[in-house]
């Protein structure tokens, strides 16, 4: 594939989904309190990052695209922190604060670049404001070229089929990063981007390459998708499209320091690429390169357009 300098300055992407605050507590070392067998972890640094759907929006903003995010947060300090983080990187946000809910927060404690434990607050957003969420999507969607639905199974996309139907009526492509064991709710999407683990939970364990190909083609048809992209970590990614042969993109890097957020990077680059006018094959090629960059970083990290172009020019 021909390589060139790319930019996503004209991309307009609406993101809807589960917003999460990712917190990283770093320690240079940890030790055991011998008499109680209790681990002691002195914290040297704390870092907070947009996570979940907010990380998708962050990825789009960092590579130069314009994005707006719609979703829920809690009425708490964590929600304010998340909103401030997104404002800082020029993400337009239209958020609904929910009473008696905490902003979904994940705290990862790391020592010597290894994660020791993850602590989660608030399992799901519990809200009666789904109609308000849908109205906010209606108010915004006509200004965007692509819709991304980022599903972390945290409750925001409870009425996802209604959102898909709305976007289809307006001829706006719908890209979905799925979660869970019910993929039927994603029927009719333009593109679904499960990782191999998520894919196998739906179609069964795949022991051979031809099983992935056969079951991918079948799932594409069953869900009436325009395309299906299965991300496969060190084995790259495989794209299925209607009436086309599957296309495999070998992994651009076999080195992975941390795969956290890599799926967000993939769908963000694809969305920005399609919104700019690149083909789906080009979009997946760029996303594959982008994922190879972020998995070499620790935590929920993004990349910028200069990093992406630098790697492209050395392919």
From Swiss-Prot:
Annotated GO CC locations: cytosol
Family to which the UniProt record says this protein belongs: Belongs to the carbohydrate kinase PfkB family.
UniProt key word Cell membrane: no
Organism of derivation: Buchnera aphidicola subsp. Acyrthosiphon pisum (strain APS) (Acyrthosiphon pisum symbiotic bacterium)
NCBIfam families: rfaE_dom_I
Keywords: Kinase, Transferase
Name the record gives this protein: Uncharacterized sugar kinase BU060
Pfam families: PfkB
Coiled-coil portions: none
EC number: 2.7.1.-
The organism's taxonomic lineage, starting at the top: Bacteria, Pseudomonadati, Pseudomonadota, Gammaproteobacteria, Enterobacterales
Keyword Transferase: yes
Gene3D superfamilies, A to Z: 3.40.1190.20
Molecular function terms, GO-annotated: heptose 7-phosphate kinase activity; heptose-1-phosphate adenylyltransferase activity; phosphotransferase activity, alcohol group as acceptor
InterPro entries: Carboh/pur_kinase_PfkB_CS (IPR002173), PfkB_dom (IPR011611), RfaE_dom_I (IPR011913), Ribokinase-like (IPR029056)
